[in-house]
């Protein structure tokens, strides 16, 4: 052992051990919360992806019908006049100290941004469903980003937990035991020396 077997070092190491155990408990709780959050996010992403797939299928069916009814060029002309959708905003929140994105979507506007009398129901439906799909794509992207960030943090936390559990805490315990054993041995030797000294004085 490289640590001198003194009572001062013993006290310091016991304090380090207490802090290491506290750190281990905190990190383990953090990892548990993150893993619980991940399970919920993965389940949410799965449901959204299923909804997104069915929404795209519905949108493309409506678009195909509009293309047949109005012609591809007319549909493209209407599409080029649709304003950019800017009703989404990304903000950040914290999950156990990990910064994760959240999406804010303003009230979904159902108003058609072109003259309805010049189109047909299929094109109107395609527009509305593609708007819904855009919102779902944004939600899925945000959730996937959250999953990536939290999974990365969970991996880092697991490494720290393993280091504390398998290396740092056992090493501290071993060093403490070594110092305690050494101090006890020195104490026994000192008692034996004093006993011998008393015996010599008594003769």
Curated annotation (Swiss-Prot):
Keyword Transport assigned: yes
A GO BP entry: proton motive force-driven plasma membrane ATP synthesis
UniProt gene name: atpD
Domain of life assignment: Bacteria
InterPro entries: V_ATPase_D
UniProt entry keywords in alphabetical sequence: ATP synthesis, Hydrogen ion transport, Ion transport, Transport
Organism: Thermotoga neapolitana (strain ATCC 49049 / DSM 4359 / NBRC 107923 / NS-E)
Function, in words: Produces ATP from ADP in the presence of a proton gradient across the membrane.
Name of this protein: V-type ATP synthase subunit D
GO molecular function, one term: proton-transporting ATP synthase activity, rotational mechanism
């Amino acid at each position: 052992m490289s640590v001198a077997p003194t009572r001062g070092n013993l006290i310091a190491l016991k304090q380090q051990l207490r802090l290491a155990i506290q750190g281990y408990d905190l990190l383990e709780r953090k990892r548990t919360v993150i893993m619980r959050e991940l399970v919920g996010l993965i389940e949410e992403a799965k449901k959204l992806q299923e909804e997104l797939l069915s929404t795209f299928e519905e949108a493309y069916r409506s678009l195909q019908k509009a293309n047949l009814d109005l012609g591809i060029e007319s549909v493209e002309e209407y599409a080029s006049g649709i304003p950019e959708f800017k009703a989404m905003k990304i903000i950040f929140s914290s999950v156990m100290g990990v910064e994760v994105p959240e999406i804010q979507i303003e009230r979904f506007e159902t108003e058609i941004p072109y003259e309805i009398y010049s189109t047909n129901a299929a094109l109107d439906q395609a527009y509305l469903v593609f708007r819904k799909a855009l919102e779902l794509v944004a939600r899925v992207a945000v959730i996937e980003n959250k999953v990536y960030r939290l999974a990365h943090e969970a991996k880092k936390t697991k490494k720290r937990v393993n280091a504390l559990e398998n290396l740092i805490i056992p090493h501290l315990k071993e060093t403490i035991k070594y110092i305690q054993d050494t101090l006890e041995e020195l104490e026994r030797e000192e008692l034996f020396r004093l006993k011998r000294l008393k015996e010599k004085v008594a003769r």
